[in-house]
Amino acid sequence: MSDSKMSSQDESKLEKAISQDSSSENHSINEYHGFDAHTSENIQNLARTFTHDSFKDDSSAGLLKYLTHMSEVPGVNPYEHEEINNDQLNPDSENFNAKFWVKNLRKLFESDPEYYKPSKLGIGYRNLRAYGVANDSDYQPTVTNALWKLATEGFRHFQKDDDSRYFDILKSMDAIMRPGELTVVLGRPGAGCSTLLKTIAVNTYGFHIGKESQITYDGLSPHDIERHYRGDVIYSAETDVHFPHLSVGDTLEFAARLRTPQNRGEGIDRETYAKHMASVYMATYGLSHTRNTNVGNDFVRGVSGGERKRVSIAEASLSGANIQCWDNATRGLDSATALEFIRALKTSAVILDTTPLIAIYQCSQDAYDLFDKVVVLYEGYQIFFGKATKAKEYFEKMGWKCPQRQTTADFLTSLTNPAEREPLPGYEDKVPRTAQEFETYWKNSPEYAELTKEIDEYFVECERSNTRETYRESHVAKQSNNTRPASPYTVSFFMQVRYGVARNFLRMKGDPSIPIFSVFGQLVMGLILSSVFYNLSQTTGSFYYRGAAMFFAVLFNAFSSLLEIMSLFEARPIVEKHKKYALYRPSADALASIISELPVKLAMSMSFNFVFYFMVNFRRNPGRFFFYWLMCIWCTFVMSHLFRSIGAVSTSISGAMTPATVLLLAMVIYTGFVIPTPSMLGWSRWINYINPVGYVFESLMVNEFHGREFQCAQYVPSGPGYENISRSNQVCTAVGSVPGNEMVSGTNYLAGAYQYYNSHKWRNLGITIGFAVFFLAIYIALTEFNKGAMQKGEIVLFLKGSLKKHKRKTAASNKGDIEAGPVAGKLDYQDEAEAVNNEKFTEKGSTGSVDFPENREIFFWRDLTYQVKIKKEDRVILDHVDGWVKPGQITALMGASGAGKTTLLNCLSERVTTGIITDGERLVNGHALDSSFQRSIGYVQQQDVHLPTSTVREALQFSAYLRQSNKISKKEKDDYVDYVIDLLEMTDYADALVGVAGEGLNVEQRKRLTIGVELVAKPKLLLFLDEPTSGLDSQTAWSICKLMRKLADHGQAILCTIHQPSALIMAEFDRLLFLQKGGRTAYFGELGENCQTMINYFEKYGADPCPKEANPAEWMLQVVGAAPGSHAKQDYFEVWRNSSEYQAVREEINRMEAELSKLPRDNDPEALLKYAAPLWKQYLLVSWRTIVQDWRSPGYIYSKIFLVVSAALFNGFSFFKAKNNMQGLQNQMFSVFMFFIPFNTLVQQMLPYFVKQRDVYEVREAPSRTFSWFAFIAGQITSEIPYQVAVGTIAFFCWYYPLGLYNNATPTDSVNPRGVLMWMLVTAFYVYTATMGQLCMSFSELADNAANLATLLFTMCLNFCGVLAGPDVLPGFWIFMYRCNPFTYLVQAMLSTGLANTFVKCAEREYVSVKPPNGESCSTYLDPYIKFAGGYFETRNDGSCAFCQMSSTNTFLKSVNSLYSERWRNFGIFIAFIAINIILTVIFYWLARVPKGNREKKNKK
């Protein structure tokens, strides 16, 4: 075939394939079967024809034209399918034909190109270079060096000209991808595949593109793409991020609405178009049956993982992008499903002129044959780009050998791994070795010269063409009215907001529990809080409580939206993805979220405020109530917008919650109640001016008190002996009272106590609305311009000391060659192969060689049957499975998805937590499993679950110390760890931290560590591996299989599940156990050389012969009907049960049981223990590991320190050196009360780290019997105490001394003892915070639920601790809450320790003036009253008596039920509450999280 035309023979092939395909594609809307076998064969042959030569632009256009007209299509507007009456165009019909629909659409576009203005886009680049500001290795910051690292990085940031700061991610490379071409990007993890795709998609935040790089998109620059056509060039990450409670149909319709073009055809409204497009893609990708099913995620039930991946694909397709960059989109998919996806991309490229690029792992040959172009990357170097059919020939010509049955993609990728590539005989010294040498060879090749010529012509062509103007016209034609032509978005801002509001209402509909619970929760809290102040009297005795109730109402309304920060971070990844797809502006989503939450906010506000207002007995007047509610709802709006702004500017939840908590504290203190306006210190008065909550509180207090008269509740003097005194000689104690008057004006009270005035009432409403609008504008601006989280390259983290050693070692090994790879210098390839494949490994050390544990025991099972109850129906998952695993053998466990492979592993290893084993036996040398079985095996799980803050060596040592026999010395265990490190080839990163994705070990290194953790335990019986190659590239999968072979050759027995392995990988296994659906055995036996024994078995019982070039594993899946679209000719379970091979298996099991049971058993009592290490050792190691985790998490520790320091200092200096007058005593009491405010944030900071430890323990360490549950929970509790004591000590000094409480101990010379006791109380509070968080988390699955529960308990504790309302005011029903409240005793102890035994001196405005009767002095008149009521007086010049109600702080303490004599008792009670928390944590964890009993219940035979 030439570059410009197809031969007539090719045309006939194409026409025949398409016609056959069209006739076979009418499929059901409810189920997606993929292509049938006949169609698959046609497309594969067609793909080989198409990819034999790459089409240039003109030939591609000719092909498209041919495809358009080769079948009779009407070329009508498909969105009118009801009027057209053509089922092939109706996605809701069973006869819908996706290809027919696409061809019809293409013909429609061609019928009126001036109206539809179709567009296409290619890309070409030369000298493309990407670089980052980081290193490939770094050190993990700890508490001691984090600040130094931050400072040095900040210093380096300003060194603009320091080239040492930069490193190349992609070296200079060139390529061209034209419309209609499908390109695959191949390379090992870290080669730069993702960076290349992100660069093409102009998704470069986090790294930089070199100035010398030239990139053009058919004449458009990357700046043009990013600013104006962002949605036409997209990057699709491998993760599936969606709103879990939104249905599939709603998710896709939302994307379709936002990309609905203006030129969609006359008479077609937007809703019709969007629904039709969503239905088309749901039908195309087999999602129609999931239209009304929630998408879900790992925690929310929804569609399956494969369907969720298809939802992501459909959503990206609906964006209508011309260039699509798919990053590892097939990860986790089996080869058949991946092939279906690539076929869909091929169809899109050929028919619709799109330009897809995909980075793919484990690419089958059928999939590779569909690609037009291939890019091969090696450590950031491009070592080949060109036609996919020419790549293999290019490298073979270079001198490399492609092993038999190795796919082309695997061969190309293997060339970037020195341990796997193999030169042809005679080429050992001729082939390039390093990545740089490969690139040099490539750039000197004729293929590269031809490429550069083509690229040069392409750039010249782009300069001459009018693509820029044409593409702009196409883009503008799609845009709706009121949309800027330069905008990358298709619809206007108003429409984006409207669609966003509709989507948010659908989210609420999908999960109505959240708004319902919120409204109900507000109602319940309204009932609880109002009952504390129930039915306040209309006297001056209610003044304080009315103020307290109003204060609490304002705070509750203000801070009810604090948790909106959490929802922001939940939605942020989705919003960022949609921004890159150019669906909507983030600011439009921000505004939509606020509008959509208005009904819920109004309902929540009314449910709380209506109940609270009338139960407290506030002013019962409709106008007063609605003003109260109006101020409260605007207060909610203000704080909602403020908290959202904090969340928008923060990069993490913890980073947002800490400043939010400090801000909350400031607003609480400076509202005007805790510190009345006249009492605020001069330096801090401005805080009240900018505090929106203060304006709300003033207006509500004016609304409640202005114009009202209150009956005086207490007179001075009064009581015995004063019954007949005239009112003119008494005065009311309330502020604002007038001597001789029984009523006190509320207006006067506000003016005297708070300096609040009625003239401010409506003014404050305007100020509050102004704050709301201001913070709304700030929030919208921040969401629009905040770039989000920066992308990070892969970095290996070491401890600081280890990093220096690592760099010295690397420098020494690479001396003289900065580009040297893992095998540098003149290493002979024969020596290299021997080094890699050497399986007689010994560790040379001071103690000589370390031997691998010898295993002579055989594990076998018979008639294993397992069932679970699903919807009240017992379902059999495993059906009478037999088998064995012998030392030195690797047994593969295979089967279709859902066949029960992992379930069988869990049953064999006694790890099932649900369901029942109803029949069968599991035997070791003929004996039943004992209590030590689980620690006698190794189980390598599919998930690589490790603690991020541990190094590789520490993780291995931890496992060795706790799982090897306690008789073995520590030195021997350490030597064995070193042995395993070398065995697994982990020496280079043995001291690296596990880290997280991007900053830590890569996928392969994590998998090796997972295997190592099990090996260092010296499993004496066998090793289970569950999908060890899942998600890995083919080279890594191969290295893992070679590792298993090495272990088996050392005598290890291995049982490994594997999903559709390649022929090379399959050859590493000795035996196969294959399960059909329902857990029924289809085959168990030897594989033989090249799997010939297995092939002979199936051919013997009627299977079609296996082609020589076929992968035996894939052939077997087709035979038994386990591959997509395949159907078995017979039930191979019945074939197996009736076969002679099955009878031989049963006889061998019976023989082993009879003979092995006679062998002597190990009678060592220690060998039968459930855990190898004693409990005290488990506890110490677990506690130390947790302490180290926190130490290496400086972000956690410093955020905790920043929170307590800022909160304590702010608190202390707000009440700086509080005086001992009446207001000063109240201020000191509220300072103690405010000291507890950081509780919630401290709990929220701590819980994620608890969850990390718990996940590692429950997923891996508990089932393997590494240590007991009691050691885990005890270690978690005690390891947190040192940090809590440390931050408590810091908080004590930052709060106690600025507040000046030590001055109160001076008169009694008890500064030191009272200071020590206060320190003990403060640190006890912080310890209590940790234990309360752990208690809430002990039985909770999610940290969010535990945090919400802790918040509820904390709120209840604050309400009933006696500060806002004492026991004499509380309704009788709530007295028990006062008595059972730990904060009651803590507050009493802190107040009595801080305030007792000193004098009170009233401020001038706190005196009340009493005029004694004629002829009496102040002394004779007031002394009787002072004897029983307390206080003191001063005689004024005019003869009146200035009376102060208190003379001693003990009087104040008595009024709040705090006695100095009970301080130690109260401290002891509070410590008892801590102990109760600890005990309940242990009990609840055991009840809720520890598996109890066994899952075995044999049926009676």
UniProtKB/Swiss-Prot annotation:
The entry's keywords: Antibiotic resistance, ATP-binding, Cycloheximide resistance, Glycoprotein, Membrane, Nucleotide-binding, Repeat, Transmembrane, Transmembrane helix, Transport
SUPFAM superfamilies: P-loop containing nucleoside triphosphate hydrolases (SSF52540)
Keyword Cytoplasm recorded: no
GO cellular component: membrane
Signal sequence region: none
Topology of this chain in the membrane: Multi-pass membrane protein
GO biological process: response to antibiotic; response to cycloheximide; xenobiotic detoxification by transmembrane export across the plasma membrane
SMART domains in the record: AAA
Segments on the Cytoplasmic face: 1-513, 786-1195
InterPro entries in UniProt: AAA+_ATPase (IPR003593), ABC2_TM (IPR013525), ABC_trans_N (IPR029481), ABC_transporter-like_ATP-bd (IPR003439), ABC_transporter-like_CS (IPR017871), ABCG_PDR_1 (IPR034001), ABCG_PDR_2 (IPR034003), Drug-R_PDR/CDR (IPR005285)
Residues annotated as glycosylated: N535, N724
One Pfam family hit: PDR_CDR
GO molecular function, one term: ATP hydrolysis activity
PROSITE patterns: ABC_TRANSPORTER_1 (PS00211), ABC_TRANSPORTER_2 (PS50893)
Stretches for region Disordered: 1-30
Sequence ranges assigned to domain ABC transporter in this UniProt record: 150-404, 859-1103
Family the UniProt entry places it in: Belongs to the ABC transporter superfamily. ABCG family. PDR (TC 3.A.1.205) subfamily.
PANTHER family with a match to the protein in the record: ATP-BINDING CASSETTE TRANSPORTER
Matching NCBIfam families: 3a01205
Protein name: Multidrug resistance protein CDR1
